[in-house]
Amino acid sequence: MTTLIYDSTFEGLLTAVFEVFEYKYDAVEIIAKENYTQENFFAETHEVITDFEKSDRVLKKLEENLGKEGISQLMLVYFSERKDLERLILSAVRHSINHPKQNILKDFGNDDMLEISKICRSV
């Protein structure tokens, strides 16, 4: 398990998502710096430095796959301040990359997409 620690900004989160793909991390957890506590001494940690070029690339790919409405929904998840917001956003990006022609945020058969939908309706 690799833990990516980012600076709590949306751009930092998108940079972390980029680095998941860049370094081909499979078992990964993304955590904001202020929420990080080292629970697993054997886990590898990687501190993410916010890179606006990387975050812009992720944003452009998301806009291509999900449109502006999809990005707005992911922003709502980010602003929800849930403990699992990073996992949900990473799951949405992975799902979007794997199914680029599909509106993955309407894929309610996927538990994470259903949870994102619930968050967006509650706001």
PLM regions: where:
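N-terminal ordered "arm"
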Residues: 1-51
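Charged, alpha-helical interface segments at or near domain boundaries
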Residues: 40, 45-123
